[in-house]
Amino acid sequence: TALIGHISRDGTAIEAREKPEKSSKPEAQKKHKRGRPRQGEIRETKQRVIQQQMAQPLTEMVAALPKACDRGVKCNAQGYKNSWNGYKLHLDTADCGIPVSALLTSASVHDSQVAVPLSLMTAKRVTHLYDLMDAAYCSEALRAHSRRLGHVPLIDHNPRGGEKQPFAPHEAQRYQERTQAERTNGRLKDDFGGRHLRVKGHAKVMSHLMFGLLALSAEQWMRLHI
C-alpha cells in the first residue's frame, strides 16, 4: 500500500439551480433560571454534532448529515464572506492532487461537522501521516480524533477573539501543502463541470460532481506517470 504524506481537508461551495428548502423553526428550548440548578433538578445538556459522531458508526454519521439545498455562507481565502444557494462539497485530497473521499451536504453545514466521517472514509482507503485543516476545523475534539487514527493533526488555530497560536516553523512548512485542496477545488469547478450544474436534487448533484472528480483523478494520475 502506498504511503501518503498529507491529506488536505476542505469544504467548497456548490451553487445549484434550485430554490433553497425553507428551514423549519427550531423548537423553543425551556429556559432555566440563572445560576446553579436546584437540588434534585436535572438540566439536559445538548450534545454537539462532533461529540455525537464519536459514538456513531460511519453509516449513521453520513445519514444524519443535512442534504437539502439551502443557503450557505463561507469566508474565502481573502477573508471576505460569500453566500450562495445550493450545497457544499467536502473533500479529502492527497498531496499528489488526487481526491480520496467526498461528501455532499447542505450549503449551511459547517465544515467541522463533516471532518469525522470524512476522516474515517479516508482511513479505510489510504495510509497517510498528516491531516491538514484550516481554522474552520479548529477543535480539540478533532485533534484528538486525528491522533486516535494515528495521524498528526495540523489545524490552523482559530483565536476566537483571543491570541492566535502560530505553527512551529516545521509545521508551517508542512501546512503549505494544504494549498493542494484549493487547487483541486478550483480545477473541479473550472475544468470538470463543478460550476455548471444542470440537475437538481442531492443525488443527481452528487452524481454530476463524482463524474467530474473521476475525470479529474484520471487526468491527475496520468500527469503523475508521464
List PLM regions with ranges.
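Charge-patterned, long linear interaction tracts outside catalytic cores
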Residues: 200-226
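Hydrophobic alpha-helical segments
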Residues: 125, 184-187, 191-195, 217, ...
